[in-house]
A protein has these predicted regions:
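Glycan-recognition surfaces
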Residues: 404-438, 442, 488-603
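C-terminal outer-membrane/trafficking sorting elements
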Residues: 9, 738-820
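Sec-dependent N-terminal signal peptides
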Residues: 3-15
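C-terminal beta-strand-rich structural cap/linker in extracellular carbohydrate-active enzymes
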Residues: 711-734
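Exposed aromatic-hydrophobic patches
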Residues: 682-686, 714-717, 789-795
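Aromatic-lined carbohydrate-binding/catalytic grooves of carbohydrate-active enzymes
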Residues: 293, 297-449, 454-478
């Protein structure tokens, strides 16, 4: 021990340790030992966790035929040192090992921080000759192929994180007896103890990273590799003609550096993934956004290519008249009207869109004929992307060929591999773009300036994973990898959106880099059905932590009655879908509320017939989006619900059932039942959601309005098949500064009659509701409601009726409705 202390003292003072001696770096629960035989062992809590760790690089010298590879297991180090350091994360000490093959040197660094519970690994390669440029597309910052048991737990699983949200992929979970490669970050966790291992890249400026993990017997690490330079079919780097993976681009310079990788063991794997995301955000801050969750409506849920301006206006008006006063608006009292694909220049003219933004949806007054009208004070959205479609190769790029700007076609801006266009999917129509080509900048500048003139404040950018592909070369010679090109292109979009005060939501997009958008779709396209909701929650089960990277996670448009589904969705199915929005972040409706939206073709339907089911959707929307308690949560909070137990799944890709979110005033718990046939019964331990029983004032279920009686250590739930329950636990001691403020200035009531059912929703609790015809005769009545919503059967003729609601506080509210 005295010898070891002397060696460590030498390391800290002189910087370099004798290569014949053991070098040991300790900090907190960590120990890193570089033995005298050059083996590297990582211990955690006194247990060997990773043995025979190594680094490896391949390289070539630009302008020469020289190339090589260096592996720390096969070359003796020229120096080993322990040095103090300070970076964006904090200060600490690092073990640095240098290896040289006579042409280039590899520096392997493992850093431990004074105040961080993890290790950071990086590898750097540089030429031994001054002035030479070195290039690498394969840098392993940390690896092992030696079996070692994880420090805790005997029933581990591992999480595979998808590269992007395209192709209907999912987060996947495997027994820890297989091998997988996760994208950018991987996690191994024990479902019983929650102990976890997390490894992931915290730099996303140059590299695509692959995290390869192989386990055995659910407790042994057999292989671990943290690779800068990973490409595959799933990163959309694939040549469909030759059936080969396209290699990663080269990082080059006086030296080439890998990404930095966080490596950590955590008592709770969920804390580990959150810590990983927070570390990324410390290094590269996310795009700032203080506007809260977007709440609104999108044309893509149902209207799609049949969209037209009268239908959009009627839908927006219905939302304003019937849902706004029930709290369906964002924290700034606005809703979004998002015009998706097939709007600009297809179903709607530029002039019509401009009229929407500058007049109909504005926050001021405008003239329509002799009338002065008040705008709806809504935010208008439009749809764009970073992609090239194969039918546009010869088409002129808008924004080029004007003034002194050169003319370009979309084919000019293609990113090519082996001289050919790079298609992201076999037989697919969309192709990779070179975001560094001037045509892209000119097009974005032209497009967003037009949108700004139309008062666009919300932009959905789709297929932007087309900008992160690898290729032969880029227009800008300083760009040499797909990630570098993506950052270049997204910065153009972000800077323009910032200039025009626009919210950016990414649709089909890589998860990393993240700093160029305020929101991102957490998964691929989904609409109304129960299985689609389970798919959305798969992304929250294993990817809720991405709310540290994006201000808003987006669950796609929330559809109640999908076109062509013949109103087959149950109310439980609708509640599940709406709750996926609550648990994720954004709250965007997808239904049509207008009979002016008609089919523009006869492809599977009658041309000219009304699209979908507007009247049925209105009735359901009042039930689902007229719930003031649900709306209040979405309006006043950002961030995603966290899984309570990630080990409750029954399949490799399935979502969890129970999620929670802690706010200053409440703890929210959502319990999903994705089974169509069997009720789900159980209980939630207060300990599992982080609240003391003595701090619970009331438990209310928000969909039924019922008050739940808790037990000493838990509360029970019973969720019908294909349904969901959301419990709100009010705290006795709430955070004063952040208590939710109800922005509704006065109670309000909205109602709709659809078929033989009347739905009444209010922003405050109702005691009873009566329905009157215009003669004053009561045709229906319901008492003892004690909830913000009432649904009752009616048998009435077409015509106008009056709803009269007796509120819980004794006041009365009325609304006029029409039975059609």
């Amino acid at each position: 021990m005295k010898i070891r202390n002397l060696i460590l003292t030498m390391a800290l003072t002189a910087g370099t340790v004798s290569l014949m001696a053991e070098t040991k770096l300790e900090q907190g629960r960590w120990s890193i030992v570089n033995a005298d035989d050059n083996t590297l062992t990582i211990s955690f809590d006194g247990k060997e966790a990773i043995k025979n760790a190594y680094a490896e690089v391949t390289y070539r010298i630009a302008g020469t035929e020289a190339s090589g590879s260096i592996n720390s297991m096969t070359v003796s180090p020229s120096s080993v040192s322990i040095v103090p350091f300070e970076d964006e994360i904090g200060s600490g000490r690092a073990l640095t090992r240098v290896y040289d093959d006579g042409r280039a040197s590899m520096t392997h660094t493992l850093s431990l921080y004074d105040k961080a519970p993890y290790m950071i690994a990086r590898v750097v390669v540089a030429s031994d000759n001054d002035g030479e440029v070195i290039e690498s597309n394969h840098m392993v910052a940390f690896a092992t192929e030696t079996r070692c048991q994880l420090p805790e737990g005997t029933s581990h699983r591992m999480i595979k994180v998808p590269f992007d949200n395209d192709g209907h992929g999912r987060y996947e979970v495997y027994d820890f007896s297989n091998e997988m490669t996760s994208h950018e970050v991987g996690c191994v966790f024990d479902a019983t103890t929650k102990f976890g291992f997390v490894a992931g890249s915290v730099d996303h400026d140059k590299w695509k990273s692959g995290i390869t993990i192989k386990g055995s017997y659910k407790r042994f690490i057999e292989k671990l590799e943290l690779l800068s330079g990973y490409t595959s079919q799933l990163t959309r780097d694939y040549d469909w003609e030759t059936k080969t993976v396209i290699p990663h681009g080269y990082v080059k310079g006086a030296k080439a550096e890998s990404a930095r990788y966080l490596i950590g063991f955590f008592d709770d794997w969920r804390v580990g993934l959150e810590t990983f995301a927070e570390t990324c955000a410390t290094i590269t801050p996310p795009a700032p956004w203080d506007g809260g969750n977007p709440m609104g409506w999108s044309t893509w849920g149902v209207m799609m290519n049949h969209v037209n301006t009268p239908a959009v206006k009627e839908t927006a008006q219905w939302i304003k008249d019937n849902l706004f006063d029930l709290g369906f608006h964002d924290k700034n009292d606005q809703t979004v009207i998002s015009l998706d694909s097939f709007c600009d220049g297809w179903g709607m003219t530029s002039s019509e869109i401009s009229q929407l933004g500058n007049r109909f949806l504005s926050d001021g007054t405008y003239k329509e004929g002799l009338q002065t009208k008040q705008g709806l004070n809504m935010r208008l959205g439009l749809y764009g992307g970073m992609v090239i479609w194969d039918w546009t190769f010869n088409g002129s790029v808008p924004g080029t060929g004007i003034r002194d700007i050169p003319s370009y076609t979309w084919g000019d801006a293609l990113l090519r591999y082996n001289g050919k266009e790079h298609r992201l999917f076999e037989g697919g129509q969309y192709c990779a773009i070179d975001p560094t080509h001037p045509a892209f900048y000119y097009n974005m500048d032209y497009t967003l300036s037009r949108w700004a003139a139309w008062k666009i404040k919300y932009i959905k950018m789709d297929f932007i994973n087309s900008g992160i592909c690898e290729g032969d070369s880029w227009y800008n010679p300083e760009i040499t990898t797909g990630v570098m090109a993506y950052n270049y292109g997204m910065k153009i979009i972000y800077d323009l959106a910032k200039k025009y005060d626009m919210y950016i939501v990414e649709s089909m997009a890589p998860l990393f880099p993240y700093q160029w958008a305020h929101g991102r779709r957490s998964c691929c396209d989904r609409f109304s059905e129960l299985g689609e909701s389970e798919y959305v929650m798969n992304a929250m089960t294993w990817g809720w932590w991405t709310d540290r990277l994006y201000a808003v996670n987006d669950p796609d448009q929330l559809v109640l009655h999908k076109d062509g589904h013949n109103k087959g969705e149950t109310e439980g199915e609708n509640r599940v879908r709406v709750t996926t929005g609550m648990c994720t972040g954004a709250f965007i409706i997808g239904d049509s509320f207008s009979d002016k939206c008609v089919y523009v073709d006869d492809n599977g339907h009658a041309k000219g017939a009304v699209v979908a089911y507007p009247e049925a959707s209105k009735a359901r929307a009042l039930k689902m989006f007229g719930n003031a308690d649900i709306n209040a949560y979405v309006r006043e909070n950002t961030g995603s619900f966290r899984p309570v137990d990630g080990g409750s799944y029954t399949g490799s890709q399935q979502a969890a059932y129970v999620y929670m979110r802690d706010t200053p005033q409440y703890v929210y718990v959502a319990v999903f039942n994705f089974s169509k046939y069997i009720a789900r019964n159980g209980s939630v331990l207060y300990e599992s959601i982080g609240i003391e029983p003595s701090n619970i004032k009331e438990i209310k279920e928000l969909w039924t309005g019922e008050t739940v009686s808790g037990k000493a250590e838990s509360f029970d739930y019973s969720v019908p098949a294909g349904d969901v329950r959301v419990f709100r636990l009010a705290k006795v001691v709430a955070g004063v500064d952040d208590i939710v403020v109800d922005r509704t200035s006065r109670p309000s009531v909205s109602a709709v009659i659809a078929g033989n059912e009347c739905v009444v929703s209010s922003s405050a609790e109702m005691a009873s509701v009566a329905l009157y015809d215009l003669s004053g005769r009561c045709v229906a009545r319901v008492d003892d409601i004690n909830h913000v919503q009432a649904v009752f059967d009616v048998n009435v003729q077409k015509g106008v009726y009056i709803v009269n609601a007796l509120m819980a506080d004794g006041s009365r509210l009325s609304a006029k409705i029409t039975a059609r």
